[in-house]
Amino acid sequence: MSAPTKPHARPQGAGNSVPNTVKPATQFPSKPAVAKLERVSPEQLTGAQSVIRSLEELDVEVIFGIPGGAVLLVYDPLFYSKKLRHVLVRHEQGAGHAASGYAHVTGKVGVCMATSGPGATNLVTPLADAQMDSVPVVAITGQVGRSLIGTDAFQEADISGITMPITKHNFLVRAGDDIPRVLAEAFHIASSGRPGAVLVDIPKDVLQGQCKFSWPPKMDLPGYKPNTKPHNRQIRAAAKLIADARKPVLYVGGGVIRGEATEQLRDLAELTGIPVVSTLMARGAFPDSHHQNLGMPGMHGTVAAVAALQRSDLLIALGTRFDDRVTGKLDSFAPDAKVIHADIDPAEIGKNRHADVPIVGDVKAVIVELIAMLRHYEVPGNIEMTDWWSYLDGVRKTYPLSYSPQSDGTLSPEYVIEKLGEIVGPEAVYVAGVGQHQMWAAQFISYEKPRTWLNSGGLGTMGFAIPAAMGAKIARPEAEVWAIDGDGCFQMTNQELATCAIEGAPIKVALINNGNLGMVRQWQALFYQERYSQTDLATHSHRIPDFVKLAEALGCVGLRCECEEDVVDVINQARAINNRPVVIDFIVGADAQVWPMVAAGASNDEIQAARGIRPLFDDESEGHV
């Protein structure tokens, strides 16, 4: 929804100019980006100064952006800010994804900024991406002057109209006095309830004119009241269903990470002994090393996780949205299961699957109250799941995640990613692009902690990895950050490696170079009789580009690995370099495919552990329960 700001006056003010000092994000106070309680007396400022002062009061640490005509006025007071670090990216898409990466690993609001017209429209994809994955991002864009809006002026684009369907909310500021209130509201909306993307569009003459500033402003959001407290009656009904279940599953989504509820999830799982499946966006919400973790469900999930959902009699869905990549053909998904669906967003409940017990509320509060109710009714220890666990353990043992070496002797991408996870370990942050490498990274790296796995789950945005990894590294400079990218994705946003080199963000890139648009090629092999139309990128046949030379040109160290014997050494070599970004060009086989797989639109009953092998529903010897 889009809202022009209201013209009523607000208290006002301006601060002293101080020289700009660039600092890593962690040197700034680690506080949520919300309005402070300390009152700032009214001052007279320009609109641009009001923007900078508001961001300072909101404890913003970093802004990712590019200056341009309509937003240039904001960059002048930014020059004097002692509190705000600005990262000059090479493309506005990089700014948006970097803001998302920052928000992913910190839980704070990520901030990006662009000028009007093409600058603003270049933010469309990252805003849609953040909104789909419930990532708190605020984008500030310049706009042509108010009198020019609607005249097709130079670099004019109706960015508030364009982004209306892909943001949680957006604003077109029409009065300078409204800037503090609007920015406070934008940060509140982005970070509360179900997090999401918010855009604030400010005309050039509003930035240029005089206005009043004071802090904190009084927010005016009468229609926005996220319900965070679950209803006790629904909690009681959920506890009753759990007590009666014999084949329950905890179906966990990214909302558990967004809601900081991973410890409570573990408490619930261990209290009840119920198996856990965690979606692509929830990797790390529950430790992979835990016996109750069956892995990731869905199109490329584990056989055990898919089996658990399909054979369950109760789905306890926490912070998840029953998206098509998990459910497969919806009318055949978990056919015998009742559903408890808890989510902060009431629009998600019942959207794709009927909920027998709907619970609207903050997922942490839901789990805490559910645990208390289960203990009250003495449910823990009384759920009979012996046969259920026997079945699931059998499936897990029979069909573990695995892969076969490449028949032509080329390097297996699965081996590369598996070794990377083993060597680097669970303390690192892993960021993936979209495609085969994304799925292998989700499958073959063990995630033990939340906010260590970043990817574009809902929108599936190629080019996400490099800028998002940059944002993560700037947010957490002490962390080892690996971008796992494909040669297709990498060529969309690799220019941000120059930003990384200049800004002191030494990320490491495992480039899974199979010479093709790998996932598209896999679908062509499986569903289009191997007609490989327009998927050969020539990065193998012509070495165009030469990724080692490209990395060096962008200020990075470039390495190459073509055989299994060198994988460990080259990873360790990259880890030893911490003063510059490092790119490892792993030349891998073109024919590797991601398995298990449920074909798009097919039932989860048709999962294949490998090509032509349907383990669950054809073989009666599996001991179905």
Swiss-Prot record:
InterPro entries: Acetolactate_synth_lsu, AHAS_TPP, DHS-like_NAD/FAD-binding_dom, THDP-binding, Thiamin_PyroP_enz_cen_dom, Thiamin_PyroP_enz_TPP-bd_dom, TPP-bd_CS, TPP_enz. It catalyses: 2 pyruvate + H(+) = (2S)-2-acetolactate + CO2. Keywords: Amino-acid biosynthesis, Branched-chain amino acid biosynthesis, FAD, Flavoprotein, Magnesium, Metal-binding, Thiamine pyrophosphate, Transferase. Residues 14-29 have a biased composition (Polar residues). One of its GO terms (molecular function) is acetolactate synthase activity. GO terms for biological process: isoleucine biosynthetic process; L-valine biosynthetic process. Residues 436-516 are annotated as: Thiamine pyrophosphate binding. Residues 1-29 are annotated as: Disordered. The gene is ilvB. CDD domains: TPP_AHAS, TPP_PYR_POX_like. Binds 1 Mg(2+) ion per subunit. Binds 1 thiamine pyrophosphate per subunit. It comes from Mycobacterium leprae (strain TN). This is Acetolactate synthase.
